[in-house]
A protein has these predicted regions:
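Extended amphipathic alpha-helical scaffolds
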Residues: 1-44, 48-49, 230-366, 551-565, ...
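Long, basic N-terminal domains or extensions that often function
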Residues: 1-231, 273
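Short flexible coil/turn linkers enriched for glycine and charged/polar residues
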Residues: 8-11, 21-24, 32-36, 47-53, ...
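Glycine-rich, flexible beta-strand/loop modules in the N-terminal catalytic cores of phosphate-handling
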Residues: 24-108, 113-120, 179, 186, ...
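Conserved phosphate/anionic-ligand binding catalytic regions in large, soluble enzymes, centered on
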Residues: 26-28, 36, 120-138, 327-350, ...
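Short, hydrophobic beta-strand segments
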Residues: 111-113, 183-188, 229-234, 245-254, ...
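Mobile "lid/hinge" segments at catalytic clefts and subdomain interfaces of large enzymes
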Residues: 138-258, 446-544
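Single-stranded RNA-binding regions, centering on S1/OB-family and related RNA-binding modules
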Residues: 549-551, 560-799
């Protein structure tokens, strides 16, 4: 086994090879803290036809790396997550251009996260491990690529910040490069200044050189001999010179044709003419002419830029294409905008949802929820092509993530705007910089939707064309498709007037001095301000009102110890509230309750119910309630939403009440006073007597003379019982020992000879209370002074 170590960011980074995955062409294990990543590199014999590099990159974060079992039914990892796809792109972008020219064999790189400590993100480790696996293998990958992450905390640059530090950082920058140059940049930021970004580039490159040196040391000890690759151009310089002499002027005119499709048709017609002049049987000459055509395009494109200072569409180097903006273009969406810049057009929509609709993300660190999503779609018609429309490709996921990172820092805190936000950007036309159009359209659509952004965000794609001499440099603002394809840099910059919020850069040339990078960033800022001026002219602040079709969110705070009262057993109570009111309800662990509804009345009803469930009735307090249910022994009165109590028939008036319905009906509003609350069950006893005028002497005497009910109880001083279900004027049971099954002093049964289940009259019931369906029901009624639950009903004091 071979091993190398390096101190970086205050921690030890080690790379080792030779112990595991020994049948791969190249394999290494990288460790940083307790995060461990295995990377392998393999190739297949046989040259693949075509002009592309047949490279496949796969990256997997096993949940066992964090000591977890995957969720879901199958309990194993499935298709790649968005984080894994983005990391694949992060590995692929710097490595793909770095293979020896002419190498065209199927190559696969696999990165596996074997252990994760939750502090060191494995993405940059995977880049370093993948490069090391290639460097020590037979695969012709001559120069190592290394990567670091840069943070910016309290005005200080931090190398490889931990995840906890990243939460505090104003900059989250990943930089990859060779010992000589930076080749790839990916960043999100909180409105940082361009000078901070330049300093971060410099600090990153210093660490990259050290990491590359470590890879070269490992190759010197454990590297395998490289495959021999012979690159033979399909064309000769003489052929290019010949064709340029014959068709150069025509090609130059065709390249400067206005309009993407018009230019494409002109170039295609000229190419067909040139190839048609070659005899069909001369296949070698045909292949050489085809290759020479591509070289001619490159030469004329660069000559226009560097010698004539012209762009193919006639713009100056700093000029932004014409911009048109429309907002509120779709009637039913919560927010919408069409942003058009030249021949690139994005239809961007915003949908507002409840906190429950946030995106659930599961990885080796556990479950998290993402409240802001941006989905980017690139249908084939946007470039006039015919293709199958399947799920989003890696490119679409990458572009959507870049646009999301650009907008996310400007969102209001969740405490101020609790909505889940989903943006969808559908590219309707594309001629370069569609991801930056998505940023602009997303900012406009959120403003129109009423999202209180801290500031508008715009983005612009910068390009670069370099010549043979150091001074031959053209920095291009708002590049179009051909400039992206033929140029030396694709540098996307998004931000506000104050600073940068997102960066993405891929460089095809070796070594860009700080001065050129500074000029590119300054020119990008000028372009960004120009675009923001256009956006502000269309909509300068967020709408005062949300769309009528957007849900309204209402937030209340309840005591944490009352959350269970809102949820109920198995979620029964909250489901009832949702069904009763037609709202959506989310209860957080801290007691924050969010109610979502399009109807204000329904939302207020849900709020009242929740407040009622979590409020506490107080003994001696008067309440105005509504009669919800009537039983022979009393009425159940709702004194607060979701809470009711028993108003016994004996507590309805000072005098004797024959039937409950003589006094009140269902739906009546009555004023009552809480006279008792059972400590165990929380059931509430109500009375009207304290609120009624005291009886006159005549009324009291009349009540005393009133005949008692006739019943089988005979001369009992409690009056007749009225039979099962009849009227009873019994009042609550005294605290004399509980219910039937308790140890109360009930006395012996008076009729010892009567059968237990006699169906005849029961003349000697005495002072025993009614029989219920079960002993437990009787005990509950006795303890609470209320009827027990019978037949599945709920006769308790609280609903």
């Amino acid at each position: 086994m071979y091993k190398k170590e390096l101190q970086i960011g205050g921690r030890t980074l080690s790379i080792e090879t030779g112990a595991v995955a020994r049948q791969a062409n190249g394999a290494c294990v990288i460790r940083y803290g307790d995060t461990v990543v295995l990377a392998t590199a393999c190739y297949k014999d046989g040259v693949v036809l075509g002009d592309f590099m047949p490279l496949t990159v796969d990256y997997k974060e096993y949940t066992y790396a964090g000591g977890r079992i995957p969720g879901g039914f199958f309990k194993r990892e499935g298709r790649p997550t968005e984080k894994e796809i983005l990391t694949c792109r992060l590995i692929d972008r710097p490595l793909r251009p770095s293979f020896t020219k002419g190498y065209r064999q199927d190559t696969q790189i696999i990165g596996l996260v074997l252990s994760a400590d939750g502090e060191n993100d494995p993405d940059i480790l995977a880049i370093n491990a993948a490069s090391t696996a290639l460097v020590i293998s037979e695969i012709p990958f001559p120069n190592p690529i290394s990567a670091v992450r840069i943070g910016y905390i309290d005005g200080q640059i931090v190398i490889n910040p931990t995840n906890a530090q990243r939460d505090l950082s104003d900059l989250d920058l990943v930089v990859a490069g060779t010992p000589d140059a930076i080749v790839m940049v990916e960043a999100g930021a909180r409105e940082v200044d361009e000078s901070v970004v330049l300093d971060a580039f410099e600090a990153a490159h210093n660490e990259i050189r050290r990491l590359c040196a470590m890879q070269l040391e490992l190759r010197a000890e454990a590297g395998k001999p490289k495959l021999e690759v012979t690159y033979t151009p399909k064309f000769t310089a003489d052929l290019v010179t010949e064709l340029m002499g014959q068709h150069g002027a025509t090609l130059k005119d065709a390249m400067q044709t206005k309009g993407k499709h018009e230019r494409s048709h002109a170039l295609k017609a000229l190419k067909t003419q040139i190839l048609g002049a070659v005899a069909p049987e001369d296949t070698e000459r045909l292949a050489a002419t085809h290759a020479a055509w591509a070289e001619m395009e490159v030469q004329i494109f660069r000559d226009l830029m560097l010698k004539e200072k012209k762009r193919v569409d006639g713009r100056s180097f700093t000029e932004i294409r014409p911009i048109t903006i429309e907002t509120n273009v779709l009637p039913r969406t919560h927010g919408s905008a069409i942003f058009t810049r030249g021949e690139t057009q994005a239809l961007v929509t915003v949908t507002l949802g409840t906190p429950q609709e946030a995106q659930k993300i599961e990885d080796f660190e556990g479950e998290t929820f993402q409240r802001f999503m941006l989905h980017y779609n690139f249908p084939p018609f946007s470039v006039g092509e015919v293709k199958f429309m399947r799920g989003p490709a890696r490119r679409e996921i990458g572009h959507g993530n870049l646009a999301r990172r650009a907008l996310a820092p400007m969102l209001p805190p969740q405490e101020e705007f609790a909505y889940t936000i989903r943006i969808v950007s559908d590219i309707l036309e594309s001629n370069g910089s569609s991801s930056m159009a998505s940023v602009c359209g997303g900012s406009l659509a959120m403003m129109q939707a009423g999202v209180p952004l801290r500031s508008a965000v715009a983005g612009v794609a910068m390009g670069l064309v370099t010549g043979e001499h150091a001074g031959d440099v053209a920095i291009l603002s708002d590049i179009a498709g051909m400039e992206d394809h033929e140029g030396d840099m694709d540098f996307k910059v998004a931000g506000t007037r104050k600073g940068i919020t997102a960066l993405q850069m891929d460089i095809k040339v070796a070594g860009l001095p700080r001065e050129i990078m500074a000029r590119a960033l300054a020119q990008a800022k000028d372009g960004r301000i120009h675009i923001l001026d256009k956006m502000d002219a269309a909509i300068s602040t967020h709408s005062a009102e949300l769309s009528e079709y957007a849900p309204r969110l209402y937030t209340i705070q309840i005591p944490k110890d009352r959350i269970r009262d809102v949820i109920g057993s198995g979620g029964k109570t909250i489901r009832w509230i949702v069904e009763e009111t037609g709202t959506k309800i989310d209860v957080a662990d801290d007691g924050k309750v969010t109610i979502a509804s399009n109807d204000v009345t329904s939302a207020n009803r849900a709020i009242d119910i929740i407040k009622g469930l979590t409020a506490s009735a107080e003994i001696g307090t008067n309440y105005k309630g509504t009669v919800k249910r009537i039983e022979p022994y009393g009425a159940f009165v709702e004194i607060m939403p979701g809470q009711d109590g028993l108003l016994h028939i004996s507590e309805m008036a000072h005098g004797r009440v024959g039937q409950v319905t003589d006094v009140m009906q269902i739906g009546d509003e009555v004023e009552v006073q809480v006279v008792g609350i059972e400590p165990d069950s929380g059931k509430i006893r109500l009375s009207r007597k304290p609120l009624l005028p005291p009886p006159t002497e005549e009324e009291a005497a009349a009540a005393a003379r009133a005949p008692r009910r006739d019943g089988p109880g005979g001369g009992s001083d409690r009056g007749g019982r009225g039979g099962f279900g009849g009227d009873r004027d019994r009042g609550p049971r005294r605290d004399s020992g509980g219910g039937r099954g308790g140890s109360g002093d009930r006395g012996p049964r008076r009729d010892h000879d009567r059968p237990r289940h006699s169906s005849g009259p029961r003349p000697h019931e005495g002072d025993r209370g009614p029989r219920f369906n079960s002993d437990s029901g009787a005990r509950e009624a006795s303890d609470a002074g209320m009827p027990p639950k019978t037949g599945g009903g709920d006769e308790g004091g609280n609903s």
